[in-house]
Amino acid sequence: MLKTLGRSVYLTQFEEQRASLSAFAAGGAPVFISLHISEEFDAAYCARVQEMCDFLSAQGWRILADVSEKTIRQFGCADLTALAKRLHLWGLRLDYGFSLEEMCALAQQLPVAVNASTTTPEVARQLAAGGGTVIAMHNFYPRPETGLDPEFLRESTAALQAEGLQVYGFIPGDALLRGPLYKGLPTLEAHRTAAPSAAFADLALNYGLDGIFAGDPEVSAREQEYIRHFCTTGELCLPVVLRPGYETLYDRTFTCRPDSPKGLVRYQESRLYSCFGSTVQPDNCAERRRRCVTMDNIGYGRYSGEIQLVRTDLPADEKVNVIGEVPAEYDLLLDCIKRGKTFRMVKTS
C-alpha cells in the first residue's frame, strides 16, 4: 500500500506553493524538483534553488532532483554527491549523459532514479545487481496526446519491477496547473482530465506503481484528503451526486460483493443499511449508463433496496431506480473497486 502522494515543486511557482507546503505535514514525504529547466535560469538561479531546498528540507520533505552534468557546473560542485549534500537532496533522477557504471556507483551513496520509459530490462537487471537503491521513474507529458498508452505503461512497469526496481509515475493536479500549456502533467494520457484521486488509485491498483507524484504544482485539499484516506485505510472515496432522499447513503462503508459481475458493483451491505426496505417505490427508472448508482425497487421483491454501481451501459428497467451518478472526472474509480474491497460514497462539494 502506498503511504502518501509525492509533490512536484517548481522554482518559478515556489512562492505560490510555499503556503501549502508549509501547511502539509511532510514527515518524509517525497517531493520532485527539476534542476535543468532552462527558462528558470537567471543570475540568481543558484541562490533561489538553495533557498527553496533549504525550506523543503526544513519542512521534512525528501527531495528527489532531476539533474544533468550541467547542474554540477552551475552550482560549482565537485560532483553529484557534493551537490546532493549542498541542496539536502534525498535522491537524484538521472537521464541522459550518465553511464551505467556512473549510475551504479552513485546509487551506492544515495537513491538514484532512471527513466522508466527508456531503461531496458537488461539495464535494469544490472542496476539492481549493483546493490544500491535504484528507482525507475516515468516522465510526465505536458502536451495533450503525448502521454503513455495503458499497454506500454503496464508492460514497461511490470518488466522493470520483475528486475527488482521500484517504479514511480505522475498524476495531474487540479488546483494549480503548470504552464505554459496548463493541460495537466500526467504520465498516462488517459489521466489528463481525471481527478487526482482517481488517477492515483488507478496507478496504484491497476498498474501497480510503487510511488506516485503530482506533476502539477497543486492538488486541492479535497483530493488530497481522498488520497490520504485511501493510503491510510485502503478504502476508496467515491464521489457521487445522489438524488434527494438518498443522502443517508453518504459516508457509509460498503463492500463490493465478491461475486459481482464485471459490469456492476453490487453493494454487499446495501439491504442491511437500507432504511427503504420493501417500500422502495418506482422512481426515475431511467437508462442505466456507466457511472449511474441504482437501487432496486419493490418490483424486484426481496431485492428491493439493493444498490448497484453501473460499469457497463444498461437499458432502463421499471424495477430499478437511478438514484445518483458519479461525476465524469471520477470515472476511473469504477474500475478500481475490486471484488471484496471497501469503498464509501462521498458528497461532492
Please place each PLM-identified region on the residue numbering.
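Short secondary-structure transition/capping segments
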Residues: 6-9, 76-87, 105-119, 160-164, ...
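C-terminal functional modules
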Residues: 244-349
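A broad, low-specificity signal for short, low-complexity segments enriched in glycine/proline
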Residues: 52-56, 75, 171-176, 266-273
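Electropositive, surface-exposed helix/loop patches at the edges of structured domains
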Residues: 65-81, 99-104, 152-155, 205-214, ...
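Active-site beta->alpha loop and helix N-cap motifs at the rims of alpha/beta catalytic domains
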Residues: 2-133, 140
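Catalytic alpha/beta core domains of metabolic enzymes, predominantly
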Residues: 115-245
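Short, Lys/Arg-enriched, disordered terminal segments
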Residues: 1-3, 348-349
